[in-house]
Amino acid sequence: MEKLVLEPVTRIEGHAKITVQLDEEGNVKDTRFHVMEFRGFEKFLQGRRIEEAPRIVPRICGICQVQHHLASAKAVDACFGFEPEDIPETAYKMREIMNWASYVHSHGLHFYFLAAPDFIGGKDRETRNIFKIIQDSPDVAKQAIELRKNAQDIVAATGGRAIHPVSFIPGGITTELDKETQEKLLKKAKRNVEIAESTLELAIPIFEDNMDLVESLGTIETYHMGLVKNGTWDVYDGVVRVKDKNGENFAEFGPDEYTKYIAEHVKPYSWLKFPYLKELGYPDGVYRVSPLSRLNVADKMPDAAPKAQEYFKEFRNKFGYAQQPLLYHWARLIEMLAAAECMASVLEEDLSGKKIHGKLERQEGEGVGIVEAPRGTLIHHYACDKNGIITKANLIVATVQNNPAMEMGIQKVAKERIKPGVDVDDKIYNLMEMVIRAYDPCLSCATHTVDGKVKLFTLEVLDSEGNVVKRL
């Protein structure tokens, strides 16, 4: 019996590998997605003061830092007895602006730097990278950098700094915007609307040219989950909506109810858990959270995003209730445009209000904060004692919730492509990686080698006793 090992999985945030177990005839017996790093932030939080949590958790990730900051702040809000409507209006809007800016930054990073090389990069692994895109299309590369810089400038202005922001506090925010700064940010937001729309116009024909791959690669049927507010796409507030495999509403629940619906399965070969819908059990209750999931569960895009609404309608008409992982890229770009439009719309409003946080009253209790991170639904759940010391912390991040689906997707690719007598080459490995990349997993703050000069994978052949007999 042989085992094929793909390590590392490239162009993702973090460290992971894929193993494919073959039977005696050379057919695929099992496929696993391994995450080898251990973070332990839930333990780090225990014993700390509850108001410190929003300053600690952005260190979980350098990409979706804003969403950890925000989910934590919402959980701490709840611990202090604040409801979303209790947050001062200016603070609420500022929180949304930073969240949307982070979406533009993250989605832009993923498309241009991590995903696009599979579609518009080189044909072999040495040229399938961002540097090939820079060489062939320098104007596109400059546009990608401008998009991300504009978004990060807005995060810095609203969050106190661009990396690991600090401005969200219990009951509000610490940052104020003067009129001059607001006007500068509005120009950046409007420019990002233009870039986001041009990115869609660039990408859609490319996706359509690869529709055979888009329709088939790693496609599985699962439930989908995401926030909606009165049925509308929302990434900050609302209720969690779950739709079944056929696109019918399965459940809707608020933050405090998530434990009634979500449970977690554990497997010995990965630090990631395998969440599922409690009522259905594992694996029948496997669900996904993602840009595609958010479009699947939403009835429409926000009124502040009319351009994104048009792309959303076209997408829904073309694909209906979509299950294909490679459509995540298309959905991600629709969201990037929506976030840019919403951000520009709010930056045109009056943000001069001086009341930016509420009055705190210490209390013992629990709080749950749910937001939509770029990669999907993010849950922070804290409990604190009468002295405001954290006694329990539970974090359910988007990549964890997508973990079962990612593994199912690569198993489907492996069984379709790896057959007895077939030479397992770089193209097959990259197809499995493409499924993983579609989910944009965020496993840590690091991204693997993308320049093509370092060896991108190691193939180990093991005997039936697990001994390495060949390393390629």
Curated annotation (Swiss-Prot):
Give the matching SUPFAM superfamilies.
HydB/Nqo4-like
Stored InterPro entries: Ni-dep_hyd_lsu, Ni-dep_hyd_lsu_Ni_BS, NiFe-Hase_large
Gene Ontology molecular-function annotations? ferredoxin hydrogenase activity; nickel cation binding
One Pfam family of this protein, by short name?
Answer: NiFeSe_Hases
The record lists Ni(2+) as bound by 61, 64, 442, 445
Q: Does the keyword Oxidoreductase apply?
A: yes
Q: What are the record keywords, sorted?
A: Metal-binding, Nickel, Oxidoreductase
Per its UniProt record, the required cofactor names are: Ni(2+)
Which ranges does the record mark as transmembrane? none
UniProt superkingdom: Archaea
Could you tell me the EC number(s) of this protein?
1.12.99.-
State if Nucleus is listed as a keyword. no
Protein task: Part of a complex that provides reducing equivalents for heterodisulfide reductase.
Q: Name the family the entry cites.
A: Belongs to the [NiFe]/[NiFeSe] hydrogenase large subunit family.
Question: Which PANTHER family does the UniProt entry name for this protein?
Answer: COENZYME F420 HYDROGENASE, SUBUNIT ALPHA, F420-NON-REDUCING HYDROGENASE VHU SUBUNIT A
User: Subunit structure, briefly?
Assistant: The F420-non-reducing hydrogenase is composed of three subunits; MvhA, MvhD and MvhG. It forms a complex with the heterodisulfide reductase (hdr).
Q: What is this protein called?
A: F420-non-reducing hydrogenase subunit A
- Recorded source organism is Methanothermus fervidus
